[in-house]
């Protein structure tokens, strides 16, 4: 009797695995559109791609120091939180510094987005959601897709 139960459970498990794995092989994975990052709409021309790449490269160059500062503050914040006796005043001060750095990055992101719009590059085109930009590569207050994570 036990052997039949084990066989039945194994058969059910294999069946469920086979049925659920079909989604992994179906079409465009999570909207990736065969490697094109643009979310719908018509593909970018070669000129638009070059323009978008330059805008993003400039953005990353201009925000590199800010992003590094934010990462350092994030480590400092986490270290303060894990101290044997956390100092609330220091934690609040570092949190305010992180917020200020985040606002500066937001301002740069807006400038980048305006430059993209002025270049005629539709929203959602180029480097994917959020352009991998922002706080440590993807933190955009409620989303993003990669990066150092949220504080």
Swiss-Prot record:
Q: Which Gene3D superfamilies match?
A: 1.20.120.1490
Q: What is its main location?
A: periplasm
Q: Which Pfam families match?
A: Metal_resist (PF13801)
At the top level of its lineage, which domain of life is listed? Bacteria
What Gene Ontology cellular component terms go with this record? Answer: periplasmic space
List the subcellular locations: Periplasm
* First and last residue of the signal peptide: 1-26
Q: What induces it?
A: Expression is induced by indole. Expression is regulated by the ZraSR two-component system.
Q: What GO molecular-function term can you cite, just one?
A: zinc ion binding
* Outcome of gene disruption: Mutation does not affect growth or survival rate, but mutant is significantly more sensitive to polymyxin B.
Q: What's known about how it's activated or inhibited?
A: Chaperone activity is enhanced by zinc and inhibited in the presence of EDTA.
The record's keywords, sorted A to Z, are: Periplasm, Signal, Stress response, Zinc
Fill in the subunit field for this protein: Forms oligomers. Stabilization of high-order structures requires zinc.
Function according to Swiss-Prot or TrEMBL: Part of the Zra signaling pathway, an envelope stress response (ESR) system composed of the periplasmic accessory protein ZraP, the histidine kinase ZraS and the transcriptional regulator ZraR. The ZraPSR system contributes to antibiotic resistance and is important for membrane integrity in the presence of membrane-targeting biocides. ZraP acts as a modulator which has both a regulatory and a chaperone function. The zinc-bound form of ZraP modulates the response of the ZraPSR system by inhibiting the expression of the zra genes, probably by interacting with ZraS.
Q: Which family does it belong to?
A: Belongs to the ZraP family.
UniProt xrefs under NCBIfam families: PRK11546.1
Q: What is this protein called?
A: Signaling pathway modulator ZraP
Q: Which organism is it from?
A: Salmonella typhimurium (strain LT2 / SGSC1412 / ATCC 700720)
């Amino acid at each position: 009797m036990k052997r039949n139960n084990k066989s039945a459970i194994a058969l059910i498990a294999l069946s469920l695995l086979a049925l659920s794995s079909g989604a992994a092989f179906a079409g465009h994975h999570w909207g990736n559109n065969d490697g094109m990052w643009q979310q719908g709409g018509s593909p970018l021309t070669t000129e638009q791609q070059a323009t978008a790449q330059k805008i993003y490269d400039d953005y990353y160059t201009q925000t590199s120091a800010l992003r590094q500062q934010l990462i350092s503050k994030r480590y400092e914040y986490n270290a303060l939180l894990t101290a044997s006796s956390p100092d609330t005043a220091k934690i609040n001060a570092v949190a305010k510094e992180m917020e200020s750095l985040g606002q500066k990055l937001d301002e740069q992101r807006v400038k980048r987005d305006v430059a993209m719009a002025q270049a005629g590059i539709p929203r959602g085109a180029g480097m994917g959601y959020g352009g991998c930009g922002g706080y440590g590569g993807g933190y955009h207050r409620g989303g993003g897709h990669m990066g150092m994570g949220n504080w």
